[in-house]
C-alpha cells in the first residue's frame, strides 16, 4: 500500500482490486508488512522517469496452501503502452529447515485479470501470480516453507519497478537493471 498516492489513483486502484479480491472464508487478510519497493514516487504513483509501476500488491493465503499475489500495474498518463514490450518477472522463494532461501521449483502461474491489458483506460491493470507449495510426493517438500516474493516490471527491457516481501529478498536476489534483447 502506498499511503501518499493521489486520491484519484488510490480510488482507481482500490476499485479494481475490490472487484477481484473479495474475501473468501479460507483466505487471510492481505499482508504488506515488510514489503520493499521503490520509495520515491511522483504524483502518478510511479518512479520518476518510469513508464510503468507497481501501485499496489495484495497477498493472500489459500486453504490449499497456495498463495495469491495480486499486482496492480499503472502506466504513466498519455503514453501508449505496447504490451509486447512489457515483461513481469515474479519469483517466489522458499526456506529450508536450515534457513537457506532458494527460488521455488514449484510451478508459478500468472494470469492477467483485467483484459485487454493495454493501459488505454488510464487505470491499473491487474496481474495475479499464484505460488503452489511443493507436492507431498517431492522428497524435499516437507523441508520447505514459503519465504516470500520478488517482482520486477520491465518495459523495453529496462526495469521500471520492483516489489519484494520480505524486503531482504530483493537485497539477496537483486534483479537486473536491463534484460537481454529477445531479437
Which residues fall in each region the model found?
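Beta-strand elements of well-folded, non-transmembrane domains
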Residues: 71-79, 90-96, 133-137, 155-157
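Lumenal/extracellular ectodomains and adaptor appendage modules
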Residues: 67-68, 75, 88-96, 112-116, ...
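Alpha-helical protein-protein interaction scaffolds
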Residues: 1-33, 38
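Acidic, serine/threonine- and proline-rich intrinsically disordered appendage/tail regions
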Residues: 116-130, 135-183
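Short, compositionally biased P/S/T/A/G/V-rich stretches that sit at domain boundaries
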Residues: 30-61
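Extended low-complexity, serine/threonine- and proline-enriched intrinsically disordered segments
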Residues: 84-115, 148-155
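Contiguous beta-strand segments within globular domains
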Residues: 54-89, 126-128
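Compact, basic/aliphatic-enriched, mixed alpha/beta core segments that act as assembly/interaction modules
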Residues: 1-8, 95-97, 103-106, 120-126, ...
Amino acid at each position: 500500500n502506498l499511503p501518499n498516492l493521489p486520491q484519484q489513483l488510490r480510488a482507481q486502484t482500490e476499485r479494481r482490486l475490490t472487484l477481484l479480491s473479495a474475501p473468501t472464508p479460507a483466505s487471510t487478510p492481505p499482508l504488506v508488512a515488510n514489503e520493499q519497493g521503490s520509495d520515491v514516487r511522483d504524483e502518478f504513483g510511479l518512479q520518476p522517469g518510469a513508464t510503468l509501476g507497481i501501485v499496489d500488491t495484495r497477498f493472500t493465503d489459500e486453504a490449499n496452501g497456495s498463495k495469491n499475489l495480486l499486482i496492480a500495474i499503472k502506466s504513466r498518463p498519455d503514453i501508449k503502452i505496447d504490451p509486447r514490450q512489457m515483461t513481469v518477472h515474479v519469483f517466489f522463494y522458499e526456506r529450508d529447515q536450515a534457513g537457506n532461501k532458494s527460488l521455488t521449483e514449484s510451478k508459478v502461474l500468472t494470469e492477467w485479470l483485467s483484459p485487454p491489458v493495454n493501459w488505454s483506460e488510464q487505470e491499473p491493470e491487474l496481474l495475479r501470480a499464484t505460488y503452489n507449495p511443493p507436492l507431498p510426493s517431492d522428497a524435499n517438500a516437507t523441508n520447505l516453507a514459503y519465504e516470500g516474493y520478488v517482482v520486477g516490471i520491465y518495459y523495453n527491457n529496462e526495469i521500471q519497478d520492483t516489489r519484494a516481501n520480505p524486503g531482504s529478498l530483493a537485497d539477496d536476489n537483486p534483479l537486473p537493471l536491463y534484460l537481454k534483447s529477445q531479437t
